[in-house]
Amino acid sequence: KDGYPVIKTTGCKLICVGISDNKSCDRFCKKQGGSHGYCHAFGCWCEGLSGSTPTYPIPGKTCKK
């Protein structure tokens, strides 16, 4: 599946700023089991995640920074 994987401790998506963060988003997504990732709308968007990977927003859970 595709989406914004969440940081497990906060329930938030990983924030990024523009194409300069594409490499860090790609690394983050691959660590989450995705095929690749990039910065999109100020968050790391991942493609190819497993169906069990939680993505933002998580129903009933808010982002706590």
UniProtKB/Swiss-Prot annotation:
In terms of SUPFAM superfamilies, this protein maps to: Scorpion toxin-like (SSF57095)
Residue span(s) of domain LCN-type CS-alpha/beta: 1-64
Q: Where in the cell is it found?
A: Secreted
Taxonomy, superkingdom: Eukaryota
What is known about the tissue distribution of this protein? Expressed by the venom gland.
Q: Which GO terms describe its biological process?
A: defense response
Q: Which UniProt keywords apply?
A: Disulfide bond, Ion channel impairing toxin, Neurotoxin, Secreted, Toxin, Voltage-gated sodium channel impairing toxin
Q: Spell out the Gene3D superfamilies in the cross-references.
A: Knottin, scorpion toxin-like
Q: Name one GO cellular component term.
A: extracellular region
State one molecular function term (GO). Answer: toxin activity
- Could you tell me which cysteines form disulfide bridges? C12-C63, C16-C39, C25-C44, C29-C46
Q: What is known of its domains?
A: Has the structural arrangement of an alpha-helix connected to antiparallel beta-sheets by disulfide bonds (CS-alpha/beta).
Q: What more is known?
A: Negative results: has no effect on Nav1.8/SCN10A sodium channel from the grasshopper mouse, a species pain-resistant to C.sculpturatus venom.
According to its UniProt entry, what is the function of this protein?
A: Probable sodium channel inhibitor.
Family per record: Belongs to the long (4 C-C) scorpion toxin superfamily. Sodium channel inhibitor family.
Name of the protein in its database record: Toxin NaTx-22
Question: What's the source species for this entry?
Answer: Centruroides sculpturatus (Arizona bark scorpion)
Supply the source organism's classification.
Answer: Eukaryota, Metazoa, Ecdysozoa, Arthropoda, Chelicerata
